[in-house]
A protein has these predicted regions:
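Short acidic/polar hinge/loop motifs at secondary-structure boundaries
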Residues: 179-221
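Gram-negative outer-membrane beta-barrel transporters
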Residues: 508-509, 646, 664-807, 906
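C-terminal beta-signal and adjacent terminal beta-strands/loops
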Residues: 647-649, 794-841, 851-856, 860-909
Length: 909
């Protein structure tokens, strides 16, 4: 009995809590190892409360070693002679890698917006700004295909490919350091079709042009933008670039289709009241869509020089900023040795384009640091952009025989020009867009009221020579335009004024934040005949947020929550191409006498000119509203919102029909033996004929209806694993349809002639798309090894589309003379010709088509070396995937994906 009692007395235990020495936070899963003098070991790990307990200890001296990722190891020597308590404090390892935020962060404000910091941008390893969009709710990783323009399409299901619904991209405003990117004077398109190049006039900002290495942070506003920003419909992208620093930053990136080189240097000087900075950088990108397909290549060169100077003077802070930037793209001649060579080895067509953009901007601001004063800040910005754009095309045209074409600029009857069967044709498009921007903004604060007001002026002009070609050697015989210089188009001016009030008021234990503003804007320069000229547009916008009382939940954690809502109009003005389209020329053959004797030939044509200008064109307006909620507790956050946007006046190309009367000369009475030259028209009998011909013009005929739910979740970093979980996603439903009646002409021949009627239909074009997308990112950082790696599981739970039924019956129709008649469903369907305007309804064409679940797993890895001065990074998209096959309409659809990878080396010295 005494021996058992002695054994029980000599066994002890030790317990305690492991905490962070800097903030006393608990550290779960810390490792505690105890070793006695005989090197016998006992160990334990701390639980979720940071507590540990080691039992079965004999009396003696022990060495206690405590380790935790990201903290200094603690070693203590302790004598055990009884049960004891030992609390352990671990100090963070300041030499190890600090936490890097590699995801976008949702702003918990009065509207839906996302902030992307420099660390997240670097971790994405982007080639252009478009790569950053995968961080938005509903976004997903895409391969950096740079052979065609990259367009933004916020809060939308489906891809943007139809120019009739491009207002969403055109109406997303990009702002860099307070200066907007404008492209409304872009007219760079070729009037003849070719498989070379691409024209994206009226599509908005090409995100390929924006390099990411100089970006400090970017805010993407998807909800209701401040009235400080106008000429937009869909969203705001506000980019702030780096200032100061003394590092040399170099980046080398290579992936399967592109190579990128960047080098930048910062300079910074500080004095007692003065701080000056200079930043300069150079970026070069070379992208190939496919090494075997040399036409689709794209190169980008950007150079930037930025400077700032800040002076503190009493309570005032004076800031002066300036920037000089250059962006160029260089495409060599796009000829393919396997596709574009004639029999003798010479190319049959070449294409060469160049784009050179220069920008100069400045900003001067005064800020009051005395918060008791009414005056808070006065900010003034000015910028100018000048572009030199050229497209040069050459083609060896082979028609097989001499061909008559119309080349006259004068309307009326003209003999055709006979062009040879084979010739060389050249076409040059010379564009010189020029933009000026000026803005002044005043901020006043009185109590809970913060008021900002200002005005803005924009000018657009194109000094280019336009399309230059020889009409007698046309690039294509189907060209319907004539050479027109761009510099004859008048300059356009946008004038805006705005006022906005922010207020925050405590209501009991709640607080209310509200922002209400009004923007007045108009354009001038188009001329009195345009309805839009000097027409005022008002954009009222309001957002509100209610911060609910804090609540204490289990374990003493504080829960913060809030509700927000917003509504507002957003307006986008038409571009220069929409307001001043090129005149169209058409011709109808009246006489075609083509004997074997060349001296007797004569082809007479009626030349007519169509002005596709729509003087009734209006600005596109989008009504947006949203409601949302967010939660924040102990480093965890969650937000969700529902939104709806309805733009019923989007820009699109619509068809219009006109009636053209021409002569038809009868050549049967011509006696060739009596001719000494071409026949005289006065000697020939003729009959009159009327032809319906169509042309395209810009109208406010598109409706885009967006609705959806966006959500995001962020955990705090789990210290035991040094891992953070982030998730976001969205359900989008987007409807596209025509909002004004459209024309449709059956493609049939009646009595050897084209069908004589054109139907006018209420619904002629419509589709809707929907999708549910989620993205779970697992971000792990190992400071001791200098490693950051993230795994994202991007799930497309479903996507689908449906073509909406078109109108079966027309509401009216046009006859050959151009007269409009109402369509009688009971009477006209019995008419043999008119009943062809009744369209058949095929059920299978309007079935909903759904694509089922698919998941891609993407990996990004960064290794820091030499005190974080060198980084080696790797990314692999679709390293794993789940893309099961599925059946659609009884047919098996097989799916497969291909991994895409790239790597980069980054220096910060």
């Amino acid at each position: 009995m005494s021996i058992l009692t002695l054994a029980l007395v000599t066994i002890f235990s030790i317990s305690g809590t492991i905490r962070d020495a800097s903030d006393s936070s608990i550290l779960p899963d810390a490792a505690i190892v105890m070793e006695d003098r005989e090197h016998k070991i006992k160990w334990a790990t701390s639980d979720e409360s940071g507590k540990y307990c080691i039992t079965g200890l004999h009396e003696g001296t022990y060495t206690i070693k405590t380790t935790y990722i990201g903290y200094h190891t603690t070693i203590k020597v302790i004598k055990i002679g009884k049960d004891c308590t030992l609390d352990i404090l671990l100090k963070p390892d300041q030499r190890s890698l600090n936490e890097v935020v590699v995801t976008a962060i949702e702003n918990h404000g009065t509207t839906s917006s996302t902030r992307i910091g420099n660390e997240a941008i670097e971790h994405i390893q982007p080639s252009s700004f478009a790569d950053l969009l995968e961080l938005l709710p509903g976004g997903s990783a895409k391969d950096p295909v740079l052979s065609s323009p990259q367009l933004i399409n916020l809060r939308a299901a489906g891809s943007l490919t139809d120019s009739d619904y491009a207002t969403s991209a055109l109406g997303t405003k990009f702002v860099i350091d307070g200066h907007p990117i404008n492209n409304d004077a872009n007219l760079q398109s070729t009037p003849a079709y070719s498989s070379y190049g691409s024209s994206y006039v009226n599509f908005g900002t090409d995100m390929r042009e924006i390099s990411t290495e100089d970006i400090e942070n970017v805010e993407i506003v998807r909800g209701i933008a401040s009235v400080k920003y106008g000429d937009l419909t869909s969203g705001l992208v506000n980019i702030i670039r780096k200032k100061g620093g003394n590092d040399i930053h170099a980046r080398f990136k290579s992936d399967m289709k592109s190579k990128l080189f960047y080098i930048g240097k910062g300079f910074e000087w500080k004095d007692t009241n003065v701080k000056s900075t200079i930043n300069t950088s150079l970026n070069y990108l070379d992208s190939k869509a496919d090494p075997r397909y040399t036409r689709q290549n794209w190169k980008r060169l950007t150079v930037s020089l930025r400077g700032s100077r800040t002076i503190e003077q009493d309570d005032l802070l004076h800031s002066l900023n300036a920037n000089l930037d250059y962006t160029g793209s260089f495409d060599n001649e796009k000829s393919d040795a396997n596709l574009d060579l004639s029999e003798n080895g010479t190319p049959i067509e070449t294409y060469k384009s160049s784009y050179n953009k220069f920008s100069l901007g400045g900003n001067y601001s005064i800020k009051n640091t005395d918060e008791e004063k009414l005056f808070r800040s006065w900010d003034n910005s000015i910028s100018l952009y000048y572009e030199m754009d050229e497209i040069n095309r050459w083609r060896s045209v082979s028609l097989g025989l001499s061909t008559p074409v119309s080349t006259s600029l004068d309307v009326g009857e003209h003999d055709a020009t006979i062009i040879p069967a084979k010739y060389d044709a050249t076409l040059k498009v010379d564009g010189r867009p020029f933009y000026l921007f000026a803005q002044s903004n005043l901020s006043l604060v009185k109590g809970i009221h913060h008021i900002q007001m200002g005005f803005e002026w924009n000018m657009d002009k194109n000094f280019g020579k336009g399309s230059i070609f020889d009409p007698t050697r046309p690039f294509s015989t189907s060209m319907s335009v004539r050479p027109r210089p761009y510099y004859v188009i008048p300059a356009m001016h946008q004038l805006s004024a705005y006022s906005e009030e922010k207020m925050k008021k405590e209501i009991g234990k709640c607080s209310l934040e509200a922002i209400m503003g009004l923007r007045l804007e108009t354009i001038s320069g188009a001329g009195e005949k345009y309805d839009i000229n000097l027409k005022p547009y008002l954009d009222p916008r309001a957002t509100v947020r209610l911060n609910l009382p804090d609540a204490m939940i289990g374990g003493g954690y504080r829960l913060k929550s809030g509700l927000y809502a917003g509504i507002g109009y957003h307006t986008k003005f038409p571009t220069m191409d929409m307001l001043f389209p090129e005149p169209l020329y058409g011709s109808l053959t009246q006489l075609n006498y083509w004997p074997t004797e060349e001296n007797l030939r004569r082809v007479n044509m009626l030349v007519y000119r169509i002005d596709p200008t729509n003087t009734e064109l209006k600005a596109a307006r989008n009504l947006k509203w949203e409601v949302g909620a967010d939660l924040l507790c102990d480093g965890y956050s969650f937000s969700i919102n529902y939104f709806q946007e309805d733009m019923t006046s989007g820009f699109r190309y619509a068809s219009q029909y006109i009636s053209v009367e021409s002569k038809r000369y009868d050549t049967s009475s011509i006696d060739k033996s009596t001719l000494s030259g071409p026949p005289q028209l006065s000697d020939l009998p003729y009959s009159l004929d009327t032809t319906l011909t169509s042309y395209s013009f810009t109208t406010n005929g598109s409706r885009t209806l967006k609705k959806g739910v966006e959500f995001s979740f962020y955990s705090k970093r789990i210290k035991s694993l040094n891992t953070k979980f982030s998730a976001n996603g969205a359900w989008f439903r987007t409807e596209y349809m025509n909002s004004v009646p459209e024309y449709y002409k059956p493609s049939v021949i009646m009595d050897g002639k084209p069908y004589p009627y054109v139907g006018i239909y209420e619904l002629n074009d419509g589709k809707y798309y929907d999708s549910l997308v989620s993205n779970l990112m697992i971000d792990t950082q190992i400071p001791e090894l200098g490693l950051i790696f993230s795994t994202s599981l991007q799930c497309l739970w479903f996507s689908g589309y449906k073509t909406m039924p078109t109108s079966k019956y027309p509401i009216s129709y046009i006859d050959k003379s151009g007269k409009i008649h109402d369509f009688d469903k009971e009477k006209d369907v019995e008419d043999g010709a008119l009943r062809l305007l009744v369209r058949e309804y095929t059920e299978s064409l309007y079935q909903y088509q759904r694509t089922p679940f698919a998941m891609n797993v993407n990996l990004k890895l960064t290794k820091k070396l030499y005190r974080n001065k060198i980084s080696c990074s790797l990314y692999v998209n679709r390293i794993f995937d789940i893309t099961p096959n599925y059946y659609r309409n009884g047919t098996l659809v097989r799916r497969s994906v291909t991994p895409y990878f790239g790597m980069e080396l980054d220096f910060k010295i």
